[in-house]
């Protein structure tokens, strides 16, 4: 329960930072905070909820599915690292930098926290690595997919470590941290892809054929990034092309195929958890479509991001309720609990629709009205499921 407890704690603190983000931008209240504190709170929100929180939940799944006891010695660095990350955000230390993959605060406390947290991730990946290698080919589908997350979690800190030693420190701080976290950050996205597919399989609660040749795509690109970090400038055209193809092929093909398979299987015998699966897959397919449509940098990038994140979050929320019931903390899901995943989708939808950018405001308004009407009808039937 160590990692599950860290998941709950980090999500709660990440949510508190989200509240601080809103207050720090509110006229009349923003003056209560130091200048640019908004960015510290934003870093705290993303790093606590979407990095620490999702990783803690994933490692909890490793222990649960691979049936291994937790080890406090390998958990402690991650716990201490999280407190240092959250503390440096809360107290506004250093300079907050809104770079990709690991939003950063330029301060020794933050760097120490990030290092300790990823050390905890690395130590746990070492504990599960023998089982991951064994189950990649011969295990069931869930264990095979989780094995890819173990392998990639082993590679990611090593990629960051190599990047630290061979990334030149120039005058442009933003470019330095972009290069530092580029390949390792993309490996992290492969971890998230493996987590997402695992969520779908767990919510489906039915056997799915193990397509190990697709699972191979989830590890081939991170292995390539590990070696590319040694020889390539991550921000070169070759480095960016490599990571773009990783998204399109390495993540896109396995997630879309498994998403469609679980979607078809889920609609036969819908219940609350399978309805969440349908919602999660639908969101992901929408986000993936926007991702494939992106050319350069436009406002579809945040729309793609929020939609994909929503697909992960609704699955995590549903599984959290499932496990809380199994642990005896909840007897039955009420209407409020059932509405929480749906409300998460609504928030991310409005963030995405505000960012999608290419359509006229009139068209966006009509689309929003139609989707709101459809989702209201779906919610009424959703809340009635046992």
Swiss-Prot record:
It comes from the Bacteria. Keywords: Cell membrane, Membrane, Transmembrane, Transmembrane helix. It is found in: Cell membrane. The chain crosses the membrane at residues 3-23, 42-62, 72-92, 102-122, 145-165, 183-203, 212-232, 244-264, 276-296, 308-328, 333-353. Gene3D superfamilies: Cytochrome c oxidase-like, subunit I domain. InterPro entries: Cyt_c_oxase-like_su1_sf. It is a multi-pass membrane protein. One of its GO terms (cellular component) is plasma membrane. Disulfide bonds: none annotated. To R.prowazekii RP382. This is Uncharacterized protein aq_155.
